[in-house]
Amino acid sequence: MIGNSSKDNFGQQQKLSRGLKNRHIQLMAIGGAIGTGLFLGSGKSIHFAGPSILFAYLITGVFCFFIMRSLGELLLSNAGYHSFVDFVRDYLGNMAAFITGWTYWFCWISLAMADLTAVGIYTQYWLPDVPQWLPGLLALIILLIMNLATVKLFGELEFWFALIKVIAILALIVTGILLIAKGFSAASGPASLNNLWSHGGMFPNGWHGFILSFQMVVFAFVGIELVGLTAGETENPQKVIPKAINQIPVRILLFYVGALFVIMCIYPWNVLNPNESPFVQVFSAVGIVVAASLINFVVLTSAASAANSALFSTSRMVYSLAKDHHAPGLLKKLTSSNVPSNALFFSSIAILIGVSLNYLMPEQVFTLITSVSTICFIFIWGITVICHLKYRKTRQHEAKANKFKMPFYPLSNYLTLAFLAFILVILALANDTRIALFVTPVWFVLLIILYKVQTRRGHKVK
């Protein structure tokens, strides 16, 4: 059994539990790529790009697949790799590992802040008198308790969360196909394939609108790399991880492109309200009375799922950082069930602070945090691709023996890095995201200072 190890106060060797099974990983690979970016953000993306949003999802999906293939090849090249920190330290050094580890932690902490705030907003749909902070707080407590139990319970939670999302999207696609086949007619006109090009063409807002849509499209894919982080806790990583990664293209075509294709065939893109979920609008058009409540429930569980994934991934990252002396040793303590309890409490406190900030100034903080988070994820993805390039160049013997290889290397690596740089340029074009490009460097400067201070103290101790 492979796992990160540490010693408890009694000097006994402990390891992270491998409690995740194949079905957990396969559905987590889907669930990690389905969230508020698709359920809510797709309305804004369609508003910018029109039907060409389908191409934006396809293009982004290709590069996300390349990122996942490079991540998978790295993780499977060395049984000692269990997270980003492990291979970044190996190829880029301790400082890069320190920055990467804490940045990935911050990525998911910021997402959890937004998701738990969203849980409160969605709950108010049914219970408008309930304070917005209360459902988020209760959700955090419940998720913390469940994550403290066992790794297997986390897997079960994500399995059912992801299953709800999958069923909702499949129901939309099947319903949409039936409506198109029967020529269903709404107030905006009949459901037809012609809706894709009869309202200004595939690129109704030109290349400018198409390019601006990538901001929200990339955000919709944030978290797709979580399947890689779980590599250290799968029962058979050599078999499970490649299968999960290789199925990503099919899932992107079905759950992203397929769902939006059906939506825009039923409703012309220019009729959809960008401030509402297109999923809710389509189900409402069908005449299902409880459609809004059904989708609201799905979106709520989606937010809870993202928060659950955040709590899991950040605790494992903090545990790994503590094991490598990049965080206080107290954070690497494991329970009798081999769960990093102190790391879970640490991440929960950080998320709780974010819930309070989102309550005090929800609109400003949400936009800023999600934009900064997106930039940080781009950093993580870029570092992964760079590490893969160095692995191929410096470990050629290991690379030849690795059966799970990055396709079209090294062209795919360089194209992916160029795409990520392109997304940063897009973020600079939009007024509501430009500020994130100025704020994010502060985070990296802070980490560099902390690393230097920690290293200096370490030398003094020695």
Curated annotation (Swiss-Prot):
<feature type="transmembrane region" description="Helical">
    <location>
        <begin position="410"/>
        <end position="430"/>
    </location>
</feature>
<keyword id="KW-0029">Amino-acid transport</keyword>
<dbReference type="InterPro" id="IPR004840">
    <property type="entry name" value="Amino_acid_permease_CS"/>
</dbReference>
<keyword id="KW-0813">Transport</keyword>
<dbReference type="GO" id="GO:0055085">
    <property type="term" value="P:transmembrane transport"/>
</dbReference>
<feature type="transmembrane region" description="Helical">
    <location>
        <begin position="96"/>
        <end position="116"/>
    </location>
</feature>
<comment type="similarity">
    <text>Belongs to the amino acid-polyamine-organocation (APC) superfamily.</text>
</comment>
<feature type="transmembrane region" description="Helical">
    <location>
        <begin position="252"/>
        <end position="272"/>
    </location>
</feature>
<feature type="transmembrane region" description="Helical">
    <location>
        <begin position="27"/>
        <end position="47"/>
    </location>
</feature>
<dbReference type="InterPro" id="IPR004841">
    <property type="entry name" value="AA-permease/SLC12A_dom"/>
</dbReference>
<dbReference type="Pfam" id="PF00324">
    <property type="entry name" value="AA_permease"/>
</dbReference>
<keyword id="KW-0472">Membrane</keyword>
<keyword id="KW-1003">Cell membrane</keyword>
<feature type="transmembrane region" description="Helical">
    <location>
        <begin position="279"/>
        <end position="299"/>
    </location>
</feature>
<dbReference type="GO" id="GO:0006865">
    <property type="term" value="P:amino acid transport"/>
</dbReference>
<feature type="transmembrane region" description="Helical">
    <location>
        <begin position="48"/>
        <end position="68"/>
    </location>
</feature>
<feature type="transmembrane region" description="Helical">
    <location>
        <begin position="366"/>
        <end position="386"/>
    </location>
</feature>
<keyword id="KW-1133">Transmembrane helix</keyword>
<feature type="transmembrane region" description="Helical">
    <location>
        <begin position="343"/>
        <end position="363"/>
    </location>
</feature>
<protein>
    <recommendedName>
        <fullName>Amino-acid permease AapA</fullName>
    </recommendedName>
</protein>
<feature type="transmembrane region" description="Helical">
    <location>
        <begin position="134"/>
        <end position="154"/>
    </location>
</feature>
<dbReference type="GO" id="GO:0005886">
    <property type="term" value="C:plasma membrane"/>
</dbReference>
<keyword id="KW-0812">Transmembrane</keyword>
<comment type="function">
    <text>Probable amino-acid or metabolite transport protein.</text>
</comment>
<feature type="transmembrane region" description="Helical">
    <location>
        <begin position="209"/>
        <end position="229"/>
    </location>
</feature>
<feature type="transmembrane region" description="Helical">
    <location>
        <begin position="160"/>
        <end position="180"/>
    </location>
</feature>
<feature type="transmembrane region" description="Helical">
    <location>
        <begin position="435"/>
        <end position="455"/>
    </location>
</feature>
